[in-house]
């Protein structure tokens, strides 16, 4: 069998929904974590430069920002591993479903992979046998997990609910920066507002970013307009928007994973195959 025909047969069993969801998940998490990390750093600089001169006023905020940045590191690592595991689950269950409907058969490629993992002990040294045995044990343990799609449905459902909260929280800084930017637009065009320019302010204390006793805590008028014109403010604003888009993409990917896993599990259950196959 030629390489082209082998690849064509392998593509027949490819879970395209899981492939798209995996790519979207990696893209969304990378965008959310990377842009979110830099946006938090930019926010820290803006606060300590323009909104408060006393370190004690924003010390708690800095600790929270650093904690969120460490959480971002863990989130990126977790989603990379879990996304790869969900993709493997997609291949596993999609192959089982297509075997039920007669649309998928084990190819020579699959047999070759199986032989590579479990067979071919002759002619190997003790080191080669040990490596093959270790790989076989890993694949056996992974197969036990992949043989229970109901677990992945439950875990992915819980993860989707948690990420829905993350998605909602990622909209908060976008809302704050958008309000600040809108105020700056009103200051830049005083003819479009009846309020005095000096009364148009951005108050970090109002959003709980700083305590109420922080000084000055707010910036008004032309000073606020000059802040909005800085590259640092504009970059931070756009980074938060990008992080929000990344959170949305990750949420869509989790929903796609959950729908695909639920469908495969339902088909296997209804066709009398149970959860072990």
Swiss-Prot record:
Lipidation (S-palmitoyl cysteine): 6-7, 10, 109, 139, 141
Cleavable signal peptide: none
InterPro entries: Myelin_PLP, Myelin_PLP_CS
PROSITE patterns: MYELIN_PLP_1, MYELIN_PLP_2
PTM-bearing positions, type Phosphothreonine: 116, 118
Top-level taxon of the source organism: Eukaryota
Side of membrane Extracellular, spans: 37-59, 179-238
Keywords: Cell membrane, Disulfide bond, Lipoprotein, Membrane, Palmitate, Phosphoprotein, Transmembrane, Transmembrane helix
Residues linked to a lipid group, O-palmitoyl threonine type: 199
Keyword Aminoacyl-tRNA synthetase: no
Listed GO biological process terms: astrocyte development; axon development; axon ensheathment; cell maturation; central nervous system myelination; inflammatory response; long-chain fatty acid biosynthetic process; myelination
Complex and partners: Interacts with MAL.
PANTHER family xrefs: MYELIN PROTEOLIPID (PTHR11683), MYELIN PROTEOLIPID PROTEIN (PTHR11683:SF11)
Identification of the protein by name: Myelin proteolipid protein
């Amino acid at each position: 069998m030629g390489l082209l025909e082998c690849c064509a047969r392998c593509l027949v069993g490819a879970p395209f929904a899981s492939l798209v969801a995996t790519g979207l998940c990696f893209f969304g998490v990378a965008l959310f974590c990377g842009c979110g990390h830099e946006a938090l750093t930019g926010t820290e600089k803006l606060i300590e430069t323009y909104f408060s001169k006393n370190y004690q006023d924003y010390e708690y905020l800095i600790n929270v920002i650093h904690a969120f940045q460490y959480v971002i590191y863990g989130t990126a690592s977790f989603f990379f591993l879990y996304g790869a595991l969900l993709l493997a689950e997609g291949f596993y269950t999609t192959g089982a479903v297509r075997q039920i409907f007669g649309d998928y058969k084990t190819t020579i490629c699959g047999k070759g992979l199986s032989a590579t993992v479990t067979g071919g002990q002759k002619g190997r040294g003790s080191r080669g046998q040990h490596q093959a045995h270790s790989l076989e044990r890993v694949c056996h343990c992974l197969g036990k997990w992949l043989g229970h799609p109901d677990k992945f449905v439950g875990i992915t459902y819980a993860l989707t609910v948690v990420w829905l909260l993350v998605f909602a929280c990622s909209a908060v800084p976008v809302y704050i920066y958008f309000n600040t930017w809108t105020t700056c637009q009103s200051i830049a065009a005083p003819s479009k507002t009846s309020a005095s320019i000096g009364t148009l302010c951005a108050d970090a204390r109002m959003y709980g970013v700083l305590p109420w006793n922080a000084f000055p805590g707010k910036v008004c008028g032309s000073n606020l307009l000059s802040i909005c014109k800085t590259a640092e403010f504009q970059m931070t604003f756009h980074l938060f928007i990008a992080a929000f888009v990344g959170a949305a993409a990750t949420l869509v990917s989790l929903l796609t994973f959950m729908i695909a896993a639920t469908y495969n599990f339902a088909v296997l259950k209804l066709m009398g195959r149970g959860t072990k196959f």
